[in-house]
Amino acid sequence: MLHLRRFGYTAAMTDIHARVLIVGGGLVGLSLAVALGHAGITTVVVDRESPAELVAPPFDGRASAIAAASWRMLDRLGIAGRVEDVQPINEIRVSDGDAPLFLHYDHRDVGDEPLGQMVENRFTRLALFRTVAELESVTLKAPVTVGRMKRSPAGVEAVLSDGDIVRAELCVGADGRMSRLRQEAGIETLQWRYPQDGIVCTIAHAESHHGIAHERFLPAGPFAILPLTANRASLVWTERSDLAPAFMELPEAEFTAEIQRRVGDFLGPVHVVGDRFRYPLSLVLAHAFRSDRLALVGDAAHGIHPIAGQGFNLGLRDVAALAECLTDAA
């Protein structure tokens, strides 16, 4: 029996054949796997992180505002009904600081359904993992990395860190803003680093948020208060990159006071629940979304500023377009 020692371990080599190899098992990569799985397209998903870590409460602290159209897509894929702790977004209010006037979006102006849903990413991941587990045509390999990949007119061959070799007709790069697959394919990008960091945390508050999402434009950048279940909200606090580290190091009481000052008193007293996180903000736009035997989706194709909360929603549009192409070609 052939064994690999190249990656510092001994493992039996197994050939896995599939139509599609997805590198990156995040929200977009797994959504694509589900869409392809429902169409009976054999798919292998590879991700470096353990699924158990990805659904742990303190993993990254992030939540997503999923637009109504995106939620309908997740519903058709059998995912939406599995997602726990879903908070409807009934209204959106956008203001310049604490000005009394604001831009107002109300779901009642367009229909009965909410404008979108707020969900902690870990609950969406958990629903995706459960759905993938039921699809016989989808194989999830994690935690595993791609050691070497060869793309040729005949297809794709990827040697994985566990010794397996995946042979596929197409590779999909869902491996994020710093996409290794995009770089190896020589696809150039337009990118820059904003002079801002995003501070992300969850707060609990005394008064009801009534399903209203708030976006306030402050001198350092937008400050978003996004409703979650159980009188909680997800905060995305955009701050100058030179000041954000100091805010992150504040004692709990002082950090909470800074948040209370920015939120105001309409939610009553607030306190931070769980950890706080800081992310550098950047833009990455690939000059091309495809190459020979390669397609890019999600942040690997277009990573944007979180100001409008559209990252995952744009990724789902990639999923819909690519799944349609592959299904039509089946």
Residue ranges and their predicted role:
Residues 104, 218-280:
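Conserved FAD/dinucleotide-binding core of flavoprotein oxidoreductases
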Residues 28, 51, 178:
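Conserved Rossmann-like nucleotide-cofactor binding loop
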Residues 37-60:
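Glycine-rich FAD pyrophosphate-binding loop
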Residues 9, 14-16, 75-76, 85-184, ...:
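Conserved N-terminal helical subregion
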